[in-house]
Amino acid sequence: MTTQILPVILSGGSGTRLWPLSREQHPKQLLALHGDASLLQATATRLAGFTGALEVAAQPLVVCNEEYRFITAEQLRAAGRPASALILEPMGRNTAPALTLAALAAGEGDPVLLVMPADHVVTDRAAFQQAIDAGAQLARDGAVVTFGIVPDRPETGYGYIQTGEGTAHGARRIARFVEKPDLETAGRYVSSGEYLWNSGLFMMKASVWLKAIERYRPDILAACRNAIANGARDADFMRADKAAFAACPSDSIDYAVMEKLPSDAAAGIEAHVVPMSCGWSDVGAWDALWQVADKDAAGNATRGDVMLHETRGSLVLADGRMVACIGVDDVVVVETPDAVLVASKAHTQEVKQIVGRLKQAGRSEVTNHRKVYRPWGWYDSIDAGPRFQVKRIVVNPGASLSLQMHHHRAEHWIVVTGTARVTRGDEVFLVSENQSTYIPLGTKHRLENPGKVPLEMIEVQSGAYLGEDDIVRFQDTYGRG
């Protein structure tokens, strides 16, 4: 059997430093931050047209949080790269357990795993693929390979890899991994030419990773084996057992394995780093997005309805409303329907401090966008006040909401486009454009779109309590309780 490259996409990050666009229920890998595709979609298509020594499997293996399973699957389908399996983590345990789950689920043929975080940007796909081709040939022969970004400036936000002697395919030995340095130390690293940025990209055979994790962290391997053995398969979703995975220690690929390999000859596993210059960024903060974004002559990167005057070196993103900036330099302005961020570009790492305070205050802006995606479509909470809430709801063709009931609210539905099939108690009837219906408090009901075009409607809720947790589900197509 020919050895294949199996892309393994790790899609579990939250990206709190990219608030207010990134939220707990809609993290940065699901956002279109650089171009029209989301970061996840761009990652899934990054090997398109690959012509290296090894073939690439047509479908990636994706590890993601259970909360994001439906939108992750839909984005991959829309990108033409549906996953061979979506491995669902019931909770985050960092990258070493995530990769171990993927290696256990990789199937026959002992493929070379290309481990890619879902939330990176690469602007030079050809250079990326050339480096992957080099790494794949080393990994096919049993090595563990990481990829180091050739630095173009001193950077304190990344870890570094000190390189040793050259090996095959343009790679080098790994001398050591170094934590994020201060600016002076980072400058020395860049000047020496011996150091690369740690990209978080890896390649190795599935069997080699399992051998390494068994040597250094057998507790992680045992917990992941239990989680897979006691998990469940539901169509394309592979659910890790919650109790077994909860017992798994949290650790990163670097700490669990990579930092130990270079000094452990007895392991019998070579560790190489392939230098890479491909316009890479982990987009860890708003200033990092500005670095890779297209800019005008004044160094401004904009998106949406933006007007600038006497403004330089800034990142301005408008999601819905018009944003104007006058006489400001080196700022970040991010507008969303329910929150606006204004920050100095030099302080964007501190956005997480605001997120922490929002969490402490119990603010919904840290958790959800006003527009919330569901497996059946999405809704936008366009207005709310005492005892009422107004939503714009879009249901995908052929999709349906659960058969449900609310204890504390009634609902009025007005169809804007499409046709709705409504279950209300014992009744089942159609509601067409410009028609409406009413769902009394405490009545079992269901909304379906039987048509071939999206169903759009306005919902007005009224009652004493309007929280999303006031719901009793009796039947649900998507397995939600």
Q: Where are the regions a protein language model picked out?
A:
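Short coil/turn connectors at secondary-structure junctions
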Residues: 3-5, 57-58, 81-83, 108-111, ...
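Catalytic metal- and UDP-sugar-binding loop of GT-A-like glycosyltransferases, i.e.
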Residues: 10, 116, 415, 460
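Left-handed beta-helix
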Residues: 3-4, 207-414, 419-438, 445, ...
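Conserved core of the sugar-phosphate nucleotidyltransferase
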Residues: 123-247
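A short acidic, often aromatic-flanked loop/helix-cap motif at beta-alpha or helix-coil junctions
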Residues: 92-97, 153-155, 183-185, 280-281, ...
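Conserved N-terminal catalytic core of the sugar/cofactor nucleotidyltransferase
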Residues: 1-9, 16-126, 133, 149, ...
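Alpha-helical scaffold segments in soluble metabolic enzymes
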Residues: 29, 42, 46, 71, ...
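Noncatalytic nucleic-acid binding interfaces
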Residues: 457
